[in-house]
């Protein structure tokens, strides 16, 4: 029985997948805390779709996929900020326009040059078959993002919580928004290998949303989100070995189950908890 439970750890590809997924899940969850604070969940969705043309172009020209995806994500994020600043359109309309346009462009590129692009890897991810050079790329991305987040997390928090106060103390909202979108784009690129373009949105939203239901303090929220993101990613890869199922699907399903538990039973904001308190107060 013990041998069966430890079997996944005897394979190098499983160890690589579990370690890498844990790191990606943790850093994406850290960013999800800020998305919850600002109400920018849709932007995570936009970036997860917007990197597709960058990946397709990179594959077509035999370039590192991470390079193309990163610049496509940055271009999408800057486009959202620019269109929002010069037009009367609401933010959700701008986000919807950008991500649908970029995703359509990516599908067009794939259809024009289908042999150069592994569509399944883009859409669904392939963490179990990740190449060593991709591991190095993802490791560098995660390391740089983590260092920058640890250096600027307080400044980002102030920008997201109160821009007026941030300007008063000499911070530039535009600079820090660009920094955040750059980090988010980089982490989306890292998560592509784990869960694919479609499910990246869950990695950068669900842990933060779950933690948001459990606490009102940002620092605690971030810690809970990181733990949830890292643990579900590790366990998801582990379970997928026995299920012989899609790794990304298992990871996101676990995160969704934890969200539902928090949604129903959170001590302060849980649906059943609030209903019980309402009945007691009658």
Curated annotation (Swiss-Prot):
Pfam families: ABC-3. It is found in: Cell inner membrane. GO terms for cellular component: ATP-binding cassette (ABC) transporter complex; plasma membrane. SUPFAM superfamilies: ABC transporter involved in vitamin B12 uptake, BtuC. InterPro entries: ABC_BtuC-like, ABC_TroCD. It is a multi-pass membrane protein. GO terms for biological process: iron ion transport; response to zinc ion; transmembrane transport. The chain crosses the membrane at residues 17-37, 63-83, 93-113, 140-160, 164-184, 186-206, 223-243, 245-265. Keywords: Cell inner membrane, Cell membrane, Ion transport, Iron, Iron transport, Membrane, Transmembrane, Transmembrane helix, Transport. Its main location: membrane. Disulfide bonds: none annotated. CDD domains: TM_ABC_iron-siderophores_like (cd06550). It comes from the Bacteria. Part of an ATP-driven transport system HI_0359/HI_0360/HI_0361/HI_0362 for iron. Belongs to the ABC-3 integral membrane protein family. This is Probable iron transport system membrane protein HI_0360. It comes from Haemophilus influenzae (strain ATCC 51907 / DSM 11121 / KW20 / Rd).
């Amino acid at each position: 029985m013990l041998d069966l439970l430890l079997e996944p750890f005897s394979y190098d590809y499983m160890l690589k997948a579990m370690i890498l997924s844990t790191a990606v899940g943790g850093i994406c969850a850290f960013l999800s805390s800020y998305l919850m604070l600002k109400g920018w969940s849709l932007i995570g969705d936009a970036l997860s779709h917007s990197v597709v043309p960058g990946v397709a172009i990179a594959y077509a020209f035999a370039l590192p996929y991470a390079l193309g995806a990163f610049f496509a994500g940055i271009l999408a994020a800057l486009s959202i900020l620019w269109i929002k600043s010069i037009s009367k359109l609401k933010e959700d309309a701008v986000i919807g326009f950008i991500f649908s346009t970029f995703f359509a462009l990516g599908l067009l590129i794939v259809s024009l040059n289908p042999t150069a692009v592994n569509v399944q890897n883009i859409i669904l991810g392939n963490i179990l078959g990740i190449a060593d050079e991709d591991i190095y790329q993802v490791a560098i991305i995660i390391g740089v993002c983590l260092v920058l987040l640890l250096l600027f997390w307080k400044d980002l928090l102030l920008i997201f919580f109160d821009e007026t106060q941030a300007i008063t103390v000499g911070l530039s909202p535009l600079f820090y928004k660009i920094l955040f979108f750059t980090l988010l784009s980089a982490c989306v690129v890292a998560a592509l290998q784990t869960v694919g373009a479609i499910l990246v949105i869950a990695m950068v939203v669900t842990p933060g949303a779950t933690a948001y239901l459990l606490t009102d303090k940002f620092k605690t929220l971030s810690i809970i989100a990181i733990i949830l993101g890292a643990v579900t990613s590790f366990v998801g890869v582990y379970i997928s070995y026995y299920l012989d199922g899609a790794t990304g699907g298992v990871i996101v399903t676990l995160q969704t189950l934890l969200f539902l538990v928090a949604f129903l039973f959170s001590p302060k904001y849980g649906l059943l908890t609030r209903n019980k308190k309402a009945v007691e107060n009658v």
